[in-house]
Amino acid sequence: MLSFVDTRILLLLAVTSYLATSQHLFQASAGRKGPRGDKGPQGERGPPGPPGRDGEDGPPGPPGPPGPPGLGGNFAAQYDPSKAADFGPGPMGLMGPRGPPGASGPPGPPGFQGVPGEPGEPGQTGPQGPRGPPGPPGKAGEDGHPGKPGRPGERGVAGPQGARGFPGTPGLPGFKGIRGHNGLDGQKGQPGTPGTKGEPGAPGENGTPGQPGARGLPGERGRIGAPGPAGARGSDGSAGPTGPAGPIGAAGPPGFPGAPGAKGEIGPAGNVGPTGPAGPRGEIGLPGSSGPVGPPGNPGANGLPGAKGAAGLPGVAGAPGLPGPRGIPGPPGPAGPSGARGLVGEPGPAGAKGESGNKGEPGAAGPPGPPGPSGEEGKRGSNGEPGSAGPPGPAGLRGVPGSRGLPGADGRAGVMGPAGNRGASGPVGAKGPNGDAGRPGEPGLMGPRGLPGQPGSPGPAGKEGPVGFPGADGRVGPIGPAGNRGEPGNIGFPGPKGPTGEPGKPGEKGNVGLAGPRGAPGPEGNNGAQGPPGVTGNQGAKGETGPAGPPGFQGLPGPSGPAGEAGKPGERGLHGEFGVPGPAGPRGERGLPGESGAVGPAGPIGSRGPSGPPGPDGNKGEPGNVGPAGAPGPAGPGGIPGERGVAGVPGGKGEKGAPGLRGDTGATGRDGARGLPGAIGAPGPAGGAGDRGEGGPAGPAGPAGARGIPGERGEPGPVGPSGFAGPPGAAGQPGAKGERGPKGPKGETGPTGAIGPIGASGPPGPVGAAGPAGPRGDAGPPGMTGFPGAAGRVGPPGPAGITGPPGPPGPAGKDGPRGLRGDVGPVGRTGEQGIAGPPGFAGEKGPSGEAGAAGPPGTPGPQGILGAPGILGLPGSRGERGLPGIAGATGEPGPLGVSGPPGARGPSGPVGSPGPNGAPGEAGRDGNPGNDGPPGRDGAPGFKGERGAPGNPGPSGALGAPGPHGQVGPSGKPGNRGDPGPVGPVGPAGAFGPRGLAGPQGPRGEKGEPGDKGHRGLPGLKGHNGLQGLPGLAGQHGDQGPPGNNGPAGPRGPPGPSGPPGKDGRNGLPGPIGPAGVRGSHGSQGPAGPPGPPGPPGPPGPNGGGYEVGFDAEYYRADQPSLRPKDYEVDATLKTLNNQIETLLTPEGSKKNPARTCRDLRLSHPEWSSGFYWIDPNQGCTADAIRAYCDFATGETCIHASLEDIPTKTWYVSKNPKDKKHIWFGETINGGTQFEYNGEGVTTKDMATQLAFMRLLANHASQNITYHCKNSIAYMDEETGNLKKAVILQGSNDVELRAEGNSRFTFSVLVDGCSKKNNKWGKTIIEYRTNKPSRLPILDIAPLDIGGADQEFGLHIGPVCFK
């Protein structure tokens, strides 16, 4: 975006090229400025007078009000010389004394845009012709070579003390680079994701001007800004009465600036003094060589005030006065007419790459949010180090206007450059919005006069730059030699109301002058009170010029005005001094290309950084080559206009702002001081809540909105009073002589006059007839830069330029610091259940867990079934010895008896210790999304992202709140001498002022005829961007974000309930040998042995006697036949018990010896294969054992439904097929019969008991249901993509299992062949897996999409498997 000074440069260049075709200067001597006269009545239009001689220079007139907005860009495109009006020069009127400034004229209509002309060959300098009327703007020619520096002029006498001037504008900018061709505007990009605000980058190049925004409400009155570019000349207003001239005080040394006084009221008009006779005007001679500088003459006594002359050149700026207090805001000014659309400029070169920030971890990008309301203005970044100049790049395309940057830091004042060439008057620019008030700056040194710059092509109007720091007051320079009478300057804007000064001493009453003829309508006055918008009236006819009043106080230098109407040719005069270059002659044939200008030093191309805030212009530098194309910056919102501040020294270039949105049209306000800022607009309505997406990194601020639409035009306010003049400053040193510029291409030879001898300068004669225009001569010496006039009123926005293609992207900045962690996003939708994987291998048995804490005692269960007989008890204590029985004969062993009946159930054993923890069950389905958590803490700042594409324009934002009043800055340095302003209308005669010092006697001129009404002014430059628009409406909800990552594992759950008692263990190893048993009874007597050998004959025995035969026969088993059956019975009982124990430990899965679950069978017989086996989950009697399928691969126990297949047919016809609802198959369609499981000889109650035990013994269950369909949706409807027609399943504990909702109660689908109605059979396999076995088996199903005559379905109930 162009800064204010850029705009001035462009305007000066444009005016230079324009003035080259019509320029006529008048000689004037600086007289004392008289007070401003009152507004006189409108005179009738008088006849043209005879040509008069040039009068002496009058004092500079005060700045006039702003003219209409001028055109920016190249002007010759629509200029057809054949259609131009015949601007013949009129006869020159008598030079009257200087008149008081006229009132402001209304803004002229916008002119047309011209096409660029080719540069002509430079010709010899022809005689200076009369100034022609303003032509349409021509296209900027190629830059000419700098002219040779002129000789220093004679030093003039010190002028009287001038009035205190308004703050001066910044000095001329340095040489402007050659302007590239305008490119087309690029298409506006989509809004990028907002990044966090990066660190301030190095100042970037000035951006191209943004599209004008609509006029916003008036902001708070800003500081006094630098005067804006001159507006086009308005229609002459009626002349006001002339006030009396105050007495001239002796010029004192410049004092310190006093406190600002209040602005005084307009003094009464002084009487018109007598007009001196005009001598005949001689023909314009060839320029004579400049004479030596004479010593300043003593001031003569004050002469009687002369009649009011036409407005003279702007006087040398007086010492800047102290800034007055901030005036109250005036009503809004009317909107100016729209300017023609400017040619698209090329983008500027890319700015230097900003310093990279610390690299952070990149955050995940969030979806682009809706444009947010404009954020508060960021802190001002520090100025970056200036980069060295880059090599010339190709011309860039014009970028989208950037938003206004922050004011840059103040630079130090440069030394005064040598005098530059007088630039051509540029077209009147539109009044830009006031820039932000700058901070007061350090006083800068007065720089030397700069070298003459080459005229650049007029660029598009830029936004007014931020106000720089006011410089210290410079010393007043010596009064220069009187120049030729210049064209009247444009009437400048009314400055803000200054502080009220002390009333001046009343002047002596002068004689009443003759009433002049009726003057032309005066320009618009200052703002009056706000009236209702009236209908624009027709412009009044221009009145006759009244007699001139006495000179008024010195006013601000007016901005360079457009060329005035041509005067009538005068007779040939004496040879004058070397004149300024004459107007351009008729277009010659295309000349040879001139030598190239000096190329600036090539610097390394810096990486592109973010644009810095626009700084004020620096001194004019040498023209550089066209830089590389910059990327179009997004348009930013215009800032709230501040008071016009004093021009500051250049700051660093600010960042380019994001594009603003176009605001609604506001009512046009009246011109005047800035109003108070409007309140910040209400935020836009909130959008509906979207599904919470995963938290992304913090987005950057959204693009700012555009300025609001201008309001209706108010009526002009009354003219404000003029301030008193301040004391003059000390004389400044003359500038150094400029270097000789390169010679321009040779023009066609014009008619050359004979060179006369260098004589004393005679009085100028009247203007001679215009000779044929000579070709363009060498550039004359530059004139002093005049104060720029105040900025013109803001015109309505011109049409948007064609969007240029985006420039090359700058290099990405370094990553910024990592952003803070965003809020946790909502849980994503649970994915569909995958198909069951192959069964895993059985895990090894884990170590036993520690015993859990004992649970509270449960309620007593129902009486259990009689238990199996207990193990044989220990032997009882030994009975007393019975009587010996009679020995029977030994019988044969009897056969083994049948097993006795089972013994009575023994008492329940103690509760076994808890078994080992079972294997972990399969993971449950994802839970439903939890409630939104509290927002996380702010994350660390994210890395600075690359510049996003420009966002779409959002709706207009509401006008921001007005900023506080800025402090008035100190007065600025005096500006260089401005171009001569246009001649103001002659006011009525004022009262005679006190006698002025005697001036040199001028030749008496003849009375001139009033000039014709001026032509329309040039169109204004394109306006600046409007204020930020209201926040846009909330965007549509974004798509649901992707599911979040799995969360961290939850805390360890509490210990589960004690598991069921484990299975009986296998047989243990044999125990140790027990202690010796009780000694057994004696065994029975064995059979008699064989006879022994005969013994020797014994001795003769004594007398024989008897012996006792009895012994302990009861101690020996089986010797006594009566005891043997008892032994066999014991043996059989032992064997039976052993078998029973063995069957308990290793069940066979038969009906007589069922296992508790299939898992027990697999553990007991790992070598067995899967198949159907009998199980008895509730143990006890085997009569209620059930047949189940054992899958030894997975350890699952699967129980089949009694009726597995339900035939396919039309089960249900609805009376109202459109009224769809879920219909339970078992409960409603099938007569209340739910699905049953395993009916082989087991009652429903027994089966329910077995299933209950089975659920207790398992920690995981699963079941599949196959839904056969024809024209019936089972799960997803392919037409709508949703699950609203899915079936519902009823679990065992009356829980309803659905296709969507809480993830714990949702089933999944392995195959979905029932998603469309195509008159074909399909099937959908539904699977439900859970670690809550109490929910299975499935007892019923409720389809929704049934009831039509063509809708059929059937079912296959898969087995329920527990594990």
UniProtKB/Swiss-Prot annotation:
Trimers of one alpha 2(I) and two alpha 1(I) chains. Residues 684-699 have a biased composition (Gly residues). Residues 1-22 form the signal peptide. Residues 59-69, 98-110, 322-335, 1051-1060, 1088-1102 have a biased composition (Pro residues). Transmembrane segments: none annotated. Ca(2+) binds at residues 1176, 1178-1179, 1181, 1184. Disulfide bonds join 1158-1190, 1198-1361, 1269-1314. This is Collagen alpha-2(I) chain. Gene3D superfamilies: 2.60.120.1000. Glycans are attached at residues 176, 1264. It comes from Gallus gallus. The lineage of its organism: Eukaryota, Metazoa, Chordata, Craniata, Vertebrata. Residues 140-154, 737-746, 1004-1015 have a biased composition (Basic and acidic residues). Residues 1128-1363 form the Fibrillar collagen NC1 domain. Its main location: secreted. InterPro entries: Collagen, Collagen_superfamily, Fib_collagen_C. Residues 88-97, 112-128, 224-263, 299-320, 601-610, 674-683, 721-736, 748-794, 842-875, 898-931, 955-965, 986-995, 1036-1049 have a biased composition (Low complexity). The keyword Chloroplast does not apply. GO terms for cellular component: collagen type I trimer; collagen-containing extracellular matrix; extracellular space; fibrillar collagen trimer. The gene is COL1A2.
